[in-house]
């Protein structure tokens, strides 16, 4: 639901309907907070293009929609409403996270080895936050210094992928967040199918690892190895996206169509909206 609403928000933005884009992103964020990340690339591109009015309307519509959906539950059931935030603050590194991969292969006990029951992992939370801030700073540098303005889908993919890679939780369904963004950012079928295959294959050792029967289950390292391969595949996609940002002539979206960039012969950004 969140993925469909967020992607529809990008479609509305592409059709220059900023308020509708904000409403859809706000609805998506009410279902799952990650669509709020879409506003960051829009902010960067709005700054670069010098057109912040449309962005302001999108952000205002997103905030108002999110609040409109959440406020009744927030007022009637405040503890239940806040449980999502409490859970995410207190949970440790998930089995799909890079932090658990390191623990699996090295015996490292993590950033907060002496936590009591349900104590928040303060050091881990701080590390995750700092790493994501650094990623956002790098994305801002790319957005503002690339020879041609990056496409919305490219920066949005980099933002969401960075969030997943450094986050302490990567639930299996989170990979769906990347699918529409990857297709828009890097429309190369073989590359995308290779990545999707690797991601799908994580399911097999996961199930065998969780099977619970020592005679039939797999060692943890089989699972964490596939997680590492998946993360490396996502990093490769990010590298390819950055490479095409700085070499727009290699971008399939920007070559061979009307409305071309003078240097590329293709479309500037069909999802640009600015």
Q: Which residues make up each language-model segment?
A:
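Perimembrane helix-loop-helix junctions
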Residues: 37-64, 71, 75
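Aromatic/glycine/proline-enriched transmembrane-helix motif characteristic
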Residues: 92-165, 242-274
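Multi-pass, polyprenyl lipid-linked donor-dependent membrane glycosyltransferases
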Residues: 1-7, 31
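Membrane-interface transmembrane helices that cradle and orient dolichyl/undecaprenyl
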Residues: 6-20
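Aromatic-anchored segments of alpha-helical transmembrane domains
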Residues: 65-71, 160-168, 196-208
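Aromatic-enriched
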Residues: 194-274
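Transmembrane helices and adjacent periplasmic/lumenal helix-loop junctions
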Residues: 19, 23-45, 68, 165-174
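Extracytoplasmic catalytic-loop and juxtamembrane helix elements of membrane-embedded
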Residues: 73-105, 217
């Amino acid at each position: 639901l969140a993925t469909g609403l967020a992607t529809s928000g990008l479609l509305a933005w592409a059709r220059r309907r900023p308020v509708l884009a904000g409403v859809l992103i706000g609805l998506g964020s009410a279902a799952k907070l990650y669509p709020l990340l879409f506003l960051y690339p829009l902010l960067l591109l709005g700054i670069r293009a010098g057109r912040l009015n449309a962005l302001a309307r999108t952000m205002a519509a997103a905030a108002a929609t999110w609040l409109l959906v959440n406020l009744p539950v927030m007022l009637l059931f405040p503890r239940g409403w806040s449980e999502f935030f409490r859970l995410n603050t207190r949970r440790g590194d998930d089995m799909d996270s890079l932090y658990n991969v390191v623990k699996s292969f090295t015996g490292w006990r993590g950033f907060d080895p002496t936590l009591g029951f349900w104590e928040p992992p303060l050091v881990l939370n701080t590390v995750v936050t700092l790493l994501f801030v650094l990623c956002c700073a790098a994305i801002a540098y790319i957005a503002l210094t690339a020879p041609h303005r990056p496409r919305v889908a490219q920066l949005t993919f980099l933002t969401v992928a960075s969030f997943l890679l450094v986050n302490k939780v990567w639930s299996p369904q989170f990979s769906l967040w990347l699918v529409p963004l990857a297709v828009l950012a890097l429309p190369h079928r073989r590359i995308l199918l290779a990545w999707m295959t690797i991601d799908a294959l994580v399911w097999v050792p996961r199930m065998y690892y969780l099977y619970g029967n020592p005679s039939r289950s797999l060692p943890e390292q089989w699972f964490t190895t596939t997680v590492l391969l998946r993360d490396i595949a996502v990093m490769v996609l990010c590298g390819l996206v950055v490479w095409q940002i700085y070499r727009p002539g290699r971008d399939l979206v920007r070559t061979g169509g009307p409305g071309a960039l003078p240097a590329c012969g293709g479309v500037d950004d069909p999802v640009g909206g600015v």
